[in-house]
Amino acid sequence: MDLYEVESKIKELEASYNKEADNLMQELNAYKKKSPILPMYGDDPNVDKMIANKNRIIRSQYTRRENKIHKLWEKFYDDVTDIVTAEYNLPTDVAKLVVQQVRDRDIGRSELASYLDHYAIFAETVLDAVF
């Protein structure tokens, strides 16, 4: 349960996820550039209806690509939970709570390991006292 080991594992994990997230973000930006939201003109209701339908399709594609990025980072935090479980010998549910507590603090990922260490040690102490 060395903070340096945990921090290096999380940084390696984050580097791989950052690379994938960058690719997904480039894909999203390329799609936004290729398919911008179309302006409504208001002259002809049929044309506006057609434009509104096209915009709905474009927005759904934006959302689909954005959701891919969100799912990627959710998987990152699941993997961080696995690291916390393994390194601190915590039950999975407790490790999930530790990671969620750190995420709720809305800190940058650069400070993630130190906060995880703090909360994981606290959780470990509580579990030792209870059991």
Regions found by a protein language model. Name each.
Residues 1-25:
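Short, charge/polar-rich alpha-helical segments
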Residues 11, 15, 56, 62-63, ...:
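Intrinsic disorder/low-complexity segments
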Residues 20, 54-80:
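Amphipathic alpha-helical coiled-coil segments
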Residues 30, 34-37, 78, 82:
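Soluble, cytosolic/nucleoplasmic coiled-coil alpha-helices used as oligomeric scaffolds and tethers
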Residues 33-45, 88, 107-112:
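Charged, low-complexity interaction regions
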Residues 39-52, 56-59, 91:
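Extended, amphipathic alpha-helical coiled-coil scaffold segments used for oligomerization/tethering
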Residues 76-83, 87-91:
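Coiled-coil termination/hinge junctions
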Residues 88-131:
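A long, low-hydrophobicity, low-complexity, charged/polar interaction segment common
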